[in-house]
């Protein structure tokens, strides 16, 4: 299954720009981990490595490309039991807006009064 996901990601990157040519494509699939890397001639670089840590996967990766405005973009991330987390991004990712006060109060009420069955 993880091979299919990695292959689908590689295919999506390759088809995103039909004029791009693959300069490098590497993949390694093991029982306890996987790794792949793709480099295209249009500045797109994608790398990902996953390791089985006990019962859970820990996936680390990076992506980089040049935007249509000719600005270099890069993202490094980790995905584990805590979810997807951006480790670094250039340019920085936008900060999400604060949670509205009414919604925050509702969340606090729900946490204080869990549903009973």
From Swiss-Prot:
It comes from Drosophila melanogaster. InterPro entries: Casein_CS (IPR031305), Cuticle_Struct_Prot (IPR050468), Insect_cuticle (IPR000618). The keyword Mitochondrion does not apply. The keyword Signal applies. PROSITE patterns: CHIT_BIND_RR_2. Residues 1-16 form the signal peptide. One of its GO terms (biological process) is chitin-based cuticle development. GO terms for molecular function: structural constituent of chitin-based larval cuticle. Disulfide bonds: none annotated. Component of the larval cuticle. Residues 31-97 form the Chitin-binding type R&R domain. It holds the Pfam family Chitin_bind_4. Keywords: Cuticle, Signal. The gene is Cpr47Eg. It comes from the Eukaryota. This is Cuticular protein 47Eg. GO terms for cellular component: chitin-based extracellular matrix.
